[in-house]
Amino acid sequence: LDEDQRATLRSEKVGFVFQNFQLLPALTALENVMLPLELAGTQDAREKSEVFLARVGLGERLHHYPRTLSGGEQQRVAIARAFASAPVILFADEPTGNLDTETGANVVRLLFELNIEEGTTLVLVTHDTDLADRCQRKFTMSAGRLAEVL
């Protein structure tokens, strides 16, 4: 695949949740979720975004900017954004890395719930062995190479 084809594949089939959220500070929670949908030409971007923000417990925080949201709330906006585009596969890089224990547990619960409800393949990258133990399949890496399948 050339670069344009890879970009199309990523935008149509793949979702991402980053450790540092990657929210645009000048956009509200709602606008952060809507943006990739609008770029993809989704007709009901606003409605879909509102539904997913409600599903992650942020239905009352739609018009808040990232700087006014806690770390857990920002991560939930990122999760709503990722799932709203209905990806076939979702990559989550240390989804609880910047969160306290309780908030992290809530984010993990939410990720797995949406994973099941939406039928999305979820690929987690984590150093958290307890989180890894909840996954159906586990792989370890060493020096950038697949080292072991558990």
Name every feature range the model reports, one short phrase each.
Residues L1-M141:
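ABC family nucleotide-binding domain
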Residues K138-L150:
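H-loop (His-switch) and adjacent beta-strand-loop-beta switch element
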